[in-house]
A protein has these predicted regions:
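Minor-groove-contacting beta-hairpin "wing" of winged helix-turn-helix DNA-binding domains
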Residues: 41-48
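The DNA-contacting recognition helix of HTH DNA-binding domains
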Residues: 21-23
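N-terminal G-site helix/loop of the GST-like fold
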Residues: 25, 32
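Arg/Lys-rich, alpha-helical DNA-contact motif
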Residues: 1-9, 15, 48-149
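The alpha-helix within a helix-turn-helix
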Residues: 14, 28
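Residue-level "edge-of-site" marker
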Residues: 27, 40, 74
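Beta-hairpin "wing" of winged helix-turn-helix
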Residues: 34-41
């Protein structure tokens, strides 16, 4: 016997991923979390795919500090790559032309994501440089105070 997929309401989904029901609804409104089913009682019902997508979304937003626009770019690229993987599975192995097209499209989507990561890395490097400069100035001030000329 095959177990039915786990299904849960919005509060349970929010609890499982460490956010609030309001945040879940907000991500739905923005289109970052796909539409949901409704129970007979009219409650939103989610499954493990929704849970994983929300975990991924929250993880990448926290990790990279993306704006909602950037987060949409990231998730759009993820979704496009998932569709490409499905197309790949449906292709005959000898169809190199179509496979090459899929690979090129996948590379484009990865380039979008890499650009977002590189922007964040650049921002972090500037912040690191600023903090290191402040630390050098404070150490210099302290040294001057401890050992006046």
């Amino acid at each position: 016997m095959i177990d039915a997929p786990a299904r849960f309401r919005i509060g349970e989904l929010a609890r499982r991923v460490g956010t609030t029901p309001r945040a879940v609804r907000y991500y739905e409104e923005l289109g970052l979390l796909p539409g949901h089913e409704r129970s007979d009682g009219g409650h939103r019902v989610y499954d493990e795919r929704d849970e994983q997508r929300l975990r991924d979304l929250l993880h990448i937003r926290t990790l990279l500090g993306l704006s909602l626009t950037e987060l949409r770019e990231w998730m759009d690229a993820e979704d496009a790559r998932a569709r490409l993987r499905e197309r790949w599975q449906d292709l005959p192995s000898e169809d190199d032309t179509a496979r090459g097209e899929i690979i090129r499209e996948g590379l484009d989507h990865l380039a979008t994501q890499l650009a977002l990561v590189r922007t964040r890395l650049s921002d972090l490097e500037r912040l690191e440089d600023d903090l290191a400069d402040k630390r050098r100035r404070l150490r210099s001030m302290l040294a001057d105070m401890e050992h006046p000329a």
